[in-house]
Amino acid sequence: MRVLLSTAGSRGDVEPLVALAVRLQGLGVEARMCASPASAERLAEVGVPHVPVGLQLEGMLLQEGMPPPSPEEERRLAAKAIDMQFDEVPAAAEGCAAVVAAGELAAAAAVRSVAEMLGIPYFYAAYSPNYLPSPHHAPPEDERTTPGVTDNKVLWDERGQRFAKRYGDTLNSRRASVGLPPVEDVFGYGYSERPWLATDPILAPLPPDFDAVQTGTWILPDERPLSAELEAFLAAGSPPVYLGFGSASGPGIDDAARVAIEAIRAHGRRIVLLSGWADLVRPDDGADCFSVDEVNLQVLFSRAAAAIHHGSAGTEHLATLAGIPQIVIPRHTDQPYYAERVADLGIGVALEGPVPTFDAMSAAVATALAPETRARATAVAGTIRTDGAAVAARLLLDAVSREKSAVLA
């Protein structure tokens, strides 16, 4: 059996699908993945065939002083993202028994259109509950809304309308070119009628009354060793504080890192700094700060005193599973949700962004380093499920089996 996995997004969108792909391969399924060109090295490491599809996101990030894209540029990029899926995914999906998509929803809607054209089942996986439309929470804080509107249902309706306006014409034009009818609710079409929620039920529970399948988080055990230089740094002193913002970028991120380093040093702690997509650099040549470009977070977190990060789903699940206290400085999308969950669970501190004050950061570091916070983080870590990818793999195989039985009947 052959299955296609597809995502348009950052490393955080790719890694859960890597876990699912490896699990499927262990069950004898041939899993291949459509992902950005930047994913080539990672997929080669785990032996998952890679079909390069999508934009090179790292080169499109907003840096300090850069204006946001104009509406015309947004529409151009939206059309290009959808066109690339229609151009490349059909060949990759040929002969596949099912398609699983995750990440950017417009690309997923195009991928579902390809699955519809080929007559194969489609599944969408979300990495955060706040991506799922619900009257119990507002949409992610990454879109303009009508001033003064607070009703969650209205906010979700507005989001769907903006989505259709931005992507609908391109999507339906490409659908018409392959004989498919137009889609009015582009937003809902991408999500599917019953999406999967690839999150841990303790850390990120399913919203009440929402028809979705929660599988648990998809994490691939990472056995890559730390570099000899990092091992030497860790051995030379007490456990450091990890500081990194992953694929986050934009105005204020350099200042946030600077304030965090000052606060960590004020508490007499060392730092491991992840450069990330923002290309963060050490502020000086101090021996108490070690910089890394790529690192096994599963191993590093197990040896760190605390983690200061942006709160994306992937980093959040890894830090929670490791049982280390966290300080979350959220910026957008799922990050405010996970920051709030860290505070609610008592496993760390959620700070207001994008640049906390030194006093706020210093107080957060004190809380994170407190023994009671570590004890609570350790307790919560013991409740986190690690079988989410296995659950999803079995769900997928069962669904394909039912589909085949229905066809034969």
Swiss-Prot record:
Look up the EC number in the record and give it.
2.4.1.-
Key words, A-Z: Antibiotic biosynthesis, Glycosyltransferase, Transferase
Task: Please provide, alphabetically and separated by semicolons, the GO molecular function terms listed in this UniProt record.
Answer: hexosyltransferase activity; UDP-glycosyltransferase activity
Q: Which domain of life is it from?
A: Bacteria
Which pathway does the record list?
A: Antibiotic biosynthesis; vancomycin biosynthesis
Q: Which Gene3D superfamilies match?
A: Glycogen Phosphorylase B
Give the reaction(s) catalysed.
dTDP-beta-L-vancosamine + devancoaminyl-vancomycin = epivancomycin + dTDP + H(+); chloroorienticin B + dTDP-beta-L-vancosamine = chloroeremomycin + dTDP + H(+)
Top EC class of this enzyme: transferase
| Annotated GO biological process | carbohydrate metabolic process; lipid glycosylation; vancomycin biosynthetic process
Q: Which InterPro entries match?
A: EryCIII-like_C, Glycosyltransferase_28, GlycoTrans_28_N, UDP_glucos_trans
Keyword Glycosyltransferase on entry:
yes
- UniProt KW Signal keyword: no
Purpose of the protein:
Catalyzes the attachment of dTDP-L-4-epi-vancosamine to chloroorienticin B to form chloroeremomycin in the biosynthesis of glycopeptide antibiotic chloroeremomycin, a member of the vancomycin group of antibiotics. Also able to use dTDP-L-4-epi-vancosamine and devancoaminyl-vancomycin (DVV) to create epivancomycin. Acts downstream of GtfA.
Q: Which family does it belong to?
A: Belongs to the glycosyltransferase 28 family.
Q: What else is known?
A: In A.orientalis different glycosyltransferases are involved in biosynthesis of the vancomycin group of antibiotics. GtfA (AC P96558), GtfB (AC P96559) and GtfC are involved in biosynthesis of antibiotic chloroeremomycin, while GtfD (AC Q9AFC7) and GtfE (AC G4V4R9) are involved in biosynthesis of vancomycin.
User: What name has this protein been given in UniProt?
Assistant: Glycosyltransferase GtfC
